[in-house]
UniProtKB/Swiss-Prot annotation:
The lineage of its organism: Eukaryota, Metazoa, Chordata, Craniata, Vertebrata. Expressed in the brain in hypothalamus. Residues 240-261, 477-490 have a biased composition (Basic and acidic residues). This is Probable G-protein coupled receptor 101. The gene is Gpr101. It is found in: Cell membrane. GO terms for molecular function: G protein-coupled receptor activity.
Length: 511
């Protein structure tokens, strides 16, 4: 006769005993959902790490000192995915754990080994980026190939020392039947819990924040110098253009005045000469009526000459108006140049700082930043350092935030659960879905590392795109020519392609 269970208990199918609802194992649906999500995370992590590792191995020039650390990070992630994750997926099935407690202890130690190796490598990368930016001249002598390999070996030695205490009795691991996974009994050894949390989160996070804070300050100062130099060069160019436009305007004005004076003198001289010639010809005509006729001819000739003179003056006036118009346009352009000089349009690039592999690359791109015309002249003409545009600070802060926040997101909940287990019974107080989410986030770091430390780097990103194109996009076979006997003809100049050989379409259609 099976025991009857109350509302606060439920019968366990395996042991046929009544268990509190707070200690019941996860349901089959819960286990399936956990396993499916884990498989998706592990698949993406495996693909991302393999592609990035292939790119680094394919291009030897990319395997510099820093990229060796990144390659070591990929190795730790791949080992975590290949050796640890399959057992975590299998234990997500309720009432299924085929091995004994000793294997569970070994599995927890192996999980911590790869996790500590990954954390130590991230710390080394942060220090390496600090030395690269702050001490660029002495960096090659400080970070030699020999020292880089010593650091790589040191990450694994330190990880081994940090993860193996449960194997020789300091700290205990067991299989959690309620949450269906192997875990440490953190409350049984508070000292090991404190050491693990400090090694996992406190020290690495402190080193990362310190290094990237100094790197951000140095990058901001260098960008300010670049920004100031660009603004000074732009002001000099604007002043030169204004002076040049003023000189051209004065030159055109002088030419216009000289041309008007010359045209006025030339028109008056021609009128006097032609009038005197008409007076000399008039006495040769008969006296009396002939004189009258000559007088009329004189008036007529004078009228004609006056008409010509007025036409020339009119033409000269029209040319003068054109010159005046050009001069006014040049003056307006010069005034615009003065306004631009006061406004000082400076461009500061959005991609000035690029933290690929936590590295800073300064480009010469610029994004418009306008000093308002309503600002006081003392500010517009000030020689002090111009303020950095907010887009630059947001860009740098955003990238550093991605690096640090992803680290805290993946390992922070796991460390918080370890600390909480010292004072609280997590088997009964922490919901099972919270434990599942913490497991997902712990393995999510294997997906994040290839993106943060690989894809964000410009050169590595380009190589990854080329590799993906070769894997995904198949090359289409070349289209064979349907008229193999046709020859190329020289295109004439009328076609606008002089000197190039192009297939003749007319030869294909002609009989």
């Amino acid at each position: 006769m099976p025991p009857s269970c109350t509302n606060s208990t439920q019968e366990n199918n395996g042991s046929r005993v009544c268990l509190p609802l707070s200690k019941m194992p996860i349901s089959v649906a819960h286990g399936i959902i956990r396993s499916v999500v884990l498989l998706v995370i592990l698949g993406v992590a495996f693909l991302g790490n393999v592609v990035l590792g292939y790119v680094l191995h394919r291009k030897p020039n990319l395997l510099q000192v820093t990229n060796r650390f990144i390659f070591n990070l990929l190795v730790t992630d791949l080992l975590q995915v290949a050796l640890v994750a399959p057992w975590v997926v299998s234990t997500a099935i309720p009432f299924f754990w085929p091995l004994n407690i000793h294997f569970c202890t070994a599995l927890v130690s192996l999980t911590h080994l790869f996790a500590f190796a990954s954390v130590n490598t991230i710390v080394v990368v942060s220090v390496d980026r600090y030395l690269t930016i702050i001490h660029p001249l002495s960096y090659p002598s400080k970070m030699t190939n020999r020292r880089s390999y010593i650091l790589l070996y040191g990450t694994w030695i330190a990880a081994f020392l940090q993860s193996t205490p449960p194997l020789y009795g300091w700290g205990h691991a067991t299989f959690d039947d309620r949450n269906a996974f192997c875990s440490m009994i953190w409350g049984a050894s508070p000292a090991y819990t404190v050491v693990s949390v400090v090694s996992f989160l406190v020290i690495p996070l402190g080193v990362m924040i310190a290094c990237y804070s100094v790197v951000f300050g140095a990058a901001r100062r260098q960008q300010a110098l670049l920004y100031k130099a660009k603004s000074h060069r732009l002001e000099v160019r604007v002043e030169d253009s204004v002076v040049h436009e003023n000189e051209e305007g004065a030159k055109k004005r002088d030419e216009f005045q000289d041309k008007n004076e010359f045209q006025g003198q030339d028109g008056g001289g021609q009128a006097e000469a032609k009038g005197s010639s008409s007076m000399e010809e008039s006495p040769m005509v008969a006296e009396g009526s002939s004189q009258k006729t000559g007088k009329g001819s004189l008036d007529f000739s004078a009228g004609i000459m006056e008409g010509k003179d007025s036409d020339e003056v009119s033409n000269g006036s029209m040319e003068g108006l054109e010159v005046i118009t050009e001069f006014q346009a040049s003056s307006a352009k010069a005034d615009t140049g003065r306004i631009d000089a006061n406004q000082c349009n400076i461009d500061v690039g959005e991609d000035d700082v690029e933290f690929g592999m936590d590295e800073i690359h300064f480009n010469d791109d610029v994004e418009a930043m306008r000093i308002p015309e309503s600002s006081p002249p003392s500010r517009r003409n000030s020689t002090s350092d111009p303020p950095l545009p907010p887009c630059y600070e947001c860009k740098a802060a955003r990238v550093i935030f991605v690096i640090i926040s992803t680290y805290v997101l993946s390992l922070g909940p796991y460390c918080f659960l370890a600390v909480l287990a010292v004072w609280v019974d997590i088997d009964t107080r922490v919901p099972q879905w919270v434990i599942t989410i913490i497991i997902w986030l712990f393995f999510l770091q294997c997906c994040i590392h290839p993106y943060v430390y690989g894809y964000m780097h410009k050169s590595i990103k380009k190589e990854i795109q080329e590799v993906l194109k070769k894997l995904i996009c198949k090359k289409s076979p070349p289209v064979e020519d349907s008229h193999p006997d046709l020859h190329e003809t020289e295109a004439g100049t009328e076609g606008g392609i002089e000197g190039k050989a192009v297939p003749s379409h007319d030869s294909a259609t002609s009989p």
